[in-house]
Amino acid sequence: MGNSPSYNPPAGISPSDWLNLLQSAQRLNPRPSPSDFTDLKNYIHWFHKTQKKPWTFTSGGPASCPPGKFGRVPLVLATLNEVLSNDEGAPGASAPEEQPPPYDPPAVLPIISEGNRNRHRAWALRELQDIKKEIENKAPGSQVWIQTLRLAILQADPTPADLEQLCQYIASPVDQTAHMTSLTAAIAAEAANTLQGFNPQNGTLTQQSAQPNAGDLRSQYQNLWLQAWKNLPTRPSVQPWSTIVQGPAESYVEFVNRLQISLADNLPDGVPKEPIIDSLSYANANKECQQILQGRGLVAAPVGQKLQACAHWAPKTKQPAILVHTPGPKMPGPRQPAPKRPPPGPCYRCLKEGHWARDCPTKTTGPPPGPCPICKDPSHWKRDCPTLKSKKLIEGGPSAPQIITPITDSLSEAELECLLSIPLARSRPSVAVYLSGPWLQPSQNQALMLVDTGAENTVLPQNWLVRDYPRTPAAVLGAGGISRNRYNWLQGPLTLALKPEGPFITIPKILVDTFDKWQILGRDVLSRLQASISIPEEVHPPVVGVLDAPPSHIGLEHLPPPPEVPQFPLNLERLQALQDLVHRSLEAGYISPWDGPGNNPVFPVRKPNGAWRFVHDLRVTNALTKPIPALSPGPPDLTAIPTHLPHIICLDLKDAFFQIPVEDRFRSYFAFTLPTPGGLQPHRRFAWRVLPQGFINSPALFERALQEPLRQVSAAFSQSLLVSYMDDILYVSPTEEQRLQCYQTMAAHLRDLGFQVASEKTRQTPSPVPFLGQMVHERMVTYQSLPTLQISSPISLHQLQTVLGDLQWVSRGTPTTRRPLQLLYSSLKGIDDPRAIIHLSPEQQQGIAELRQALSHNARSRYNEQEPLLAYVHLTRAGSTLVLFQKGAQFPLAYFQTPLTDNQASPWGLLLLLGCQYLQAQALSSYAKTILKYYHNLPKTSLDNWIQSSEDPRVQELLQLWPQISSQGIQPPGPWKTLVTRAEVFLTPQFSPEPIPAALCLFSDGAARRGAYCLWKDHLLDFQAVPAPESAQKGELAGLLAGLAAAPPEPLNIWVDSKYLYSLLRTLVLGAWLQPDPVPSYALLYKSLLRHPAIFVGHVRSHSSASHPIASLNNYVDQLLPLETPEQWHKLTHCNSRALSRWPNPRISAWDPRSPATLCETCQRLNPTGGGKMRTIQRGWAPNHIWQADITHYKYKQFTYALHVFVDTYSGATHASAKRGLTTQTTIEGLLEAIVHLGRPKKLNTDQGANYTSKTFVRFCQQFGISLSHHVPYNPTSSGLVERTNGLLKLLLSKYHLDEPHLPMTQALSRALWTHNQINLLPILKTRWELHHSPPLAVISEGGETPKGSDKLFLYKLPGQNNRRWLGPLPALVEASGGALLATNPPVWVPWRLLKAFKCLKNDGPEDAPNRSSDG
């Protein structure tokens, strides 16, 4: 507001002192500025920091402020000191009949009018909000209240209308009325005496103060307005209804009553309060009551229905209800009424405080309208009738008191003993009542009725009466309001008694509940029954065991709202079974009656033997529970029981979970309702006193409770082994005597703790001991039952899921491989309907036969501590089968089946590593021992090749296990030979990374309608052309399959010129092919490959003009593909003159072999003279044989970069560099950087650009032994490879710059190269040899002499040298960064730090002069 700071005081000063300082600052002349308030706040901080105490008027005088440091703060302190020192003294003597109040010196600055006042302005909404925020929790008329309003008045100079607006905004209606009364009285007292400038003839003070030139008269009105607040009568502060929230220990009824009182005090008269309280009674209730109302759909219901719904809810700290009397020789006195709420103000009759107007002594009451209806005396009202006051409870009568008073004073002890006793439960007080009457049902002669001393009349449900009973409508006023359509009056006599023999009382009329919900014994019967109402002492249920200390942590300590799940109906058979189960649990002490919140449904389940089992559905409670980790990871591995402990005994505990008690605060989460037949009687509610079965944390809590007793037994018999899981205990000992002694000790110890040992389930050796569904023998472990695989197609989904679940359980103890399991699991894919019928394929039925054979080997050996652990890893395309065994054992220890983690192709070596790691973890957890040796079914050559060529970082992990890994082939020794019944694909052949000397060679090729092959070994053995489908790719596959079928089963070298077939075969070489067959013809390829013991796969270019034998034989295969025209043959051979000379068609044998080339436009442009070798199109047949180079342009921001791209024509490996300028020097620098990445090529093929044809570039290539040739650009047979690479790189650059617009060009190009070389290329093309890790050139040592070579020294600067964040494609770049290449013979590297030792020469050609500054 204006120039004033916030009214919130800073640290080190009270609110009243701070407001005094602010008001004193308002007297400064000229008016205070924001800097004055800042200086004032800085002064308070300085005072509090230096004096180590808060600022007060006595300690912070003008002398406490250093002059010149805090501006005009000394003037503010002087003004405050002057005003408070000159305040008026104590008031004079008062009237003799009233004692003057004690005088206290004022702590508030008096009202002043000195100084220049601000001009009048209307209130802004933000100013009104700030004022209300400052005084929101302050009492009206308090010091902070007065001073806050005074500061607001000094700054805005409000008119009476503005002050009235402010009063309506900040005060309640009650306070507004009291303030207006006080203000009117103050104006009337001051108007005739002390008001200066007031003329009664000109209007009222309010009207005159509103004038613009009112001046001092408005200031006087403002002072009277403030004084009226100060003169308000003191009254207790009423909590506003907007801030009322139900407390944690407050019942819902008390909360609603308190809300109604606050609404009555804070809302003006005539405002309807029912809609407001209906909404606030839910919005401000606590979460527990809100959830009850939400669950019953009563959020928008009237208050009465809400009170009725939450009637049974009680806070957790709530004490039991007030009793009429407690057991003992003496009965307590009368119940004291609840204290009345004090009045908010003085009585409007006598204007005195301390009493309500209805209790005012000056209130005059008129005579009664008629005689008293009881004694017929016309002089008094009925409430003052002496006859009514003298009636006793024992006499009864129609005018019974509102509460049942104690009868100790009116009866002797002998008379009390003759009275009937009504024992009441603490939660729902009920008593058995015997009824008789003409309108009752014959079966309702005895019933259980609720005792309610607050109900005036007795209530019966309508279903207890006959249909045609005499009735009249009744309007009943209850907690939910007036009910007009629910209750009727039964106009007929009804006889009641507490005992069959009487005494009986007769009631002329009684209320009937048409909703059949209530059966209540009201005050009209209780006052005449001549009975004593008492609450008996609590009868505790029997103590359960010695473990009476409940667990301190069960996962519900955060106390969420208990669930309210309704009980679903049950048929008569299940209901009778449930009642019997509840009765037995109640007798055993596992449950007890419950009347608190919470409910979870219950139902019985019939066991296979015909008995019933109690099931409590605690899923909602489990969802609210925080899980407790179990001590054991799961069922123990019984094969870990050592063989040197032959004596075994098994114990079983009965009702083990029911020995752990539960605290009372958690019982609401385990409550349930026992329904009655037909709902004719009230449902009974119970709650568990012990851990129930079905609770998520019951197993973990039981294990923790049983941990210490079992630990003591294990410590006493250290030479034995104790294995336990839940309530099953297995004890293994070396001798018979020790087993007997341990069993007796453990059984006695458990019985002392309250556990019951089931002696009928105790088993011991020499017979097999059953434990956890398995049989423990002396040397082995078997399963008690195995699934029967009598499966026929079709089969239902439920049956197949059951069989797979049983197979999963026994798969650890039987040699079930992953392949047949995967076949059955694959039949479940895509099935959503639970009623679906599945048709099994013949292969799946064959897998079932394999599983049936595997289940016949139901045995596992027990662990022998003297022998090492061995493992076998069997890898298949469906998954892995892992075996743990020991040497000399009859059976393995365990089988494990692990499926593929995903559908992506994974190398066999990686799967082997994962299998070894899984087996190691199982061995450590079960046997606490590491595995000595791993056997596997992979060929050693295939595994070695993966280790040498893979870039996976997990290769290092496999190398650490390499001394322990051994290839066992496909038939390992041991009892699991049935695991491998057939050879797995691509695991039998031994693939060779290099050509096999003196081996048979197979060359194959294909066209659109024909495939061909030839076999060669020192000479041509066989050749043939076979028909193929309408596809060149399938034609190549057909030629390869025909050649494999014709080749004898011996080592074979395969040469193909198809990139597709080469990639496929190389994938098989590395053992990375795990995908399903995409083409059925590949199955023939698999079988053909398995016939050869060793295979090498090579790639040859079909359009190569090289003179080596491999290219010649490949050209011969091309001749085996007869084509219709020479042009088709010319297109197939790509202008290969040597292949054209072998045209096989005799009809055109007389043709000139150069005729197709003469007619070909491409050949004419490339080789117009017909013999120039420099223009011949070639592609390399090995890495770094032939490169292609090109320069393309890329625009980024305001620069246009020249991208120098170099591509190896054999593998497609690429390097590129970005240069600002396009000169011969930059082209040489780009070639040098490519050599660093890819190695030195033998040949370089470029277009006919000026940079490539310059003498400098040609001379550079000659010095480094690089053969340079040129071609016509944009020719599909020549430069298509480098042109496509240009497009890919520019596309990747655009992507990275679109993702990061400010990415530097060097980083973007590095990412594009990494993406192209590492992702776009096939993995089989990325071996270490093929990624051009050429041997590094000789490096000059720092201590040696600098070589003296050519006078031409070409310097280059690699990208990323000065950028640490750059991530390049290869480590070789980091190793070679920061160097120079010296053009000597041979060339050598010069480290960058040694370049200063000699003069670095550069090219001095004329074309390099403009770019001399950018070189190097």
From Swiss-Prot:
Matching Pfam families: Gag_p19, Gag_p24, Gag_p24_C, IN_DBD_C, RNase_H, rve, RVP, RVT_1
Occurrences of domain RNase H type-1 (ranges): 996-1126
Residues the entry annotates as binding Mg(2+) 2: 1005, 1036, 1057, 1118
Integrase catalytic domain span: 1179-1343
Database matches in SMART domains: ZnF_C2HC
The enzyme's E.C. designation: 3.4.23.-, 2.7.7.49, 2.7.7.7, 3.1.26.4
DNA repair is among the record's keywords: no
Sequence motif: PPXY motif, positions: 100-103
Residue stretches making up the Peptidase A2 domain: 447-525
Active site residues per record: 452
Positions that bind Mg(2+) 1: 652, 727-728
Free-text cofactor note: The RT polymerase active site binds 2 magnesium ions.
Positions of Mg(2+) 3 binding: 1190, 1247
Record lipid sites (N-myristoyl glycine): 2
Swiss-Prot/TrEMBL catalytic activity: Endonucleolytic cleavage to 5'-phosphomonoester; DNA(n) + a 2'-deoxyribonucleoside 5'-triphosphate = DNA(n+1) + diphosphate
InterPro entries linked: D_retro_matrix, DNA/RNA_pol_sf, Gag_p24_C, Integrase_C_retrovir, Integrase_cat-core, Peptidase_A2_cat, Peptidase_aspartic_dom_sf, Retropepsins
Site feature Cleavage, where: 109-110, 323-324, 419-420, 544-545, 1120-1121
UniProt zinc finger (CCHC-type) residues: 345-362, 370-387
Domain of life, per lineage: Viruses
Keywords, comma-separated and alphabetical: Aspartyl protease, Capsid protein, DNA integration, DNA recombination, DNA-binding, Endonuclease, Host-virus interaction, Hydrolase, Lipoprotein, Magnesium, Metal-binding, Multifunctional enzyme, Myristate, Nuclease, Nucleotidyltransferase, Phosphoprotein, Protease, Repeat, RNA-directed DNA polymerase, Transferase, Viral budding, Viral budding via the host ESCRT complexes, Viral genome integration, Viral matrix protein, Viral nucleoprotein, Viral release from host cell, Virion, Virus entry into host cell, Zinc, Zinc-finger
Similarity section: Belongs to the retroviral Pol polyprotein family.
PANTHER family, per database record: ENDOGENOUS RETROVIRUS GROUP K MEMBER POL PROTEIN (PTHR41694), RNA-DIRECTED DNA POLYMERASE-RELATED (PTHR41694:SF3)
Protein name: Gag-Pro-Pol polyprotein
Species this chain originates from: Bovine leukemia virus (isolate Australian) (BLV)
Gene: pol
